[in-house]
Amino acid sequence: MSKSENLYSAARELIPGGVNSPVRAFTGVGGTPLFIEKADGAWLYDVDGKAYIDYVGSWGPMVLGHNHPAIRNAVIEAAERGLSFGAPTEMEVKMAELVTSLVPTMDMVRMVNSGTEATMSAIRLARGFTGRDKIIKFEGCYHGHADCLLVKAGSGALTLGQPNSPGVPADFAKHTLTCVYNDLASVRAAFEQYPQEIACIIVEPVAGNMNCVLPLPEFLPGLRALCDEFGALLIIDEVMTGFRVALAGAQDYYGVVPDLTCLGKIIGGGMPVGAFGGRRDVMDALAPTGPVYQAGTLSGNPIAMAAGFACLNEVAQPGIHETLNKLTTRLAEGLREAAQEAGIPLVVNHVGGMFGIFFTDAGSVTCYQDVMACDVERFKRFFHLMLDEGVYLAPSAFEAGFMSVAHSMDDINNTIDAARRVFAKL
């Protein structure tokens, strides 16, 4: 047995499923998950000594690549002064100044410890501010594991939320309306059915948890208009897209102004950080200035703030996003060309430093139903053959891939060459 296999066997006796987050278990592709020893730049190294070009990037945070010296040094320096104080620090102020300067729609920001905390808190704030209970989310979009967000759609375009996980009471989920991503008619139907009850829409501007599905041109502006028409708040969940699709996020790239924004992943530079913020009048409703309660023992802790501050300063440097776009575009185009040469029907969506691979002859993938119609079995074979070639992709047909500026053009071309060999075997 390999060392990864031995560790996985031991882990399953002690940790549910052997992992601390389900997708890491390779359930979506089969086989034994890799146990990682270290990472540097664009590369992962497993406990068995094998090296991989990494397109997971810790599920998004590693836009600068692994083990970036500026982030590493910032963490070491901060740790020498203490790990956590439970009191305000100067770095929290500096971090808030930086985040609000980079994302102009955020007048104020509150730091938390994860993307789930950010979305959960933003929804509570929207409900408290509007005095309404219902929320709209979209089929196939994931906003963390808060109870009100673990719901799925039924057969219709609009359904009252039904729990998608045991342990979530139906009474919690009943206020969540699920609409169809990229379908404004389903959203209008929800508002017309509950015109005075909907507090907010929460949306991934690029749906990165059903692989990578881009918004149609009219979709995000249409959501803004509907929120304005019916007095609801628009929450854009930029946990995945923030600082990756563009410096000011996908909201800037697509030209839509939210009331609240949720951030995570890149904002922590690899440390556990989330944030939510937006309009001053809305944020003023948050405790201690307002009645909506939110708190956290480790929120804004000095180690995480130091890592995030160092990361965002690097991400804000000129040319970073141009490089990211160039690398991602080259990979997407190369994969399409290689698949076409092999007669493999393939769609590759991409924007900024995100991409998604879909085995389908549909020609385009724009919603959850399109994603579900793709050939998952072929993706499983593709994943394992690419892994054999030394390329680590997301171990699920429903997760986006992530580029970093640490990837070289040689890394990209080698990945395309590997895919060409793999396509010949599919």
Curated annotation (Swiss-Prot):
Principal EC category: isomerase
Catalysis performed (reactions): (S)-4-amino-5-oxopentanoate = 5-aminolevulinate
Cofactor names: pyridoxal 5'-phosphate
Record bears the keyword Isomerase: yes
Chain positions with N6-(pyridoxal phosphate)lysine modification: 265
UniProt keyword terms in alphabetical order: Cytoplasm, Isomerase, Porphyrin biosynthesis, Pyridoxal phosphate
Pathway entry: Porphyrin-containing compound metabolism; protoporphyrin-IX biosynthesis; 5-aminolevulinate from L-glutamyl-tRNA(Glu): step 2/2
This protein's name: Glutamate-1-semialdehyde 2,1-aminomutase
Organism: Salmonella arizonae (strain ATCC BAA-731 / CDC346-86 / RSK2980)
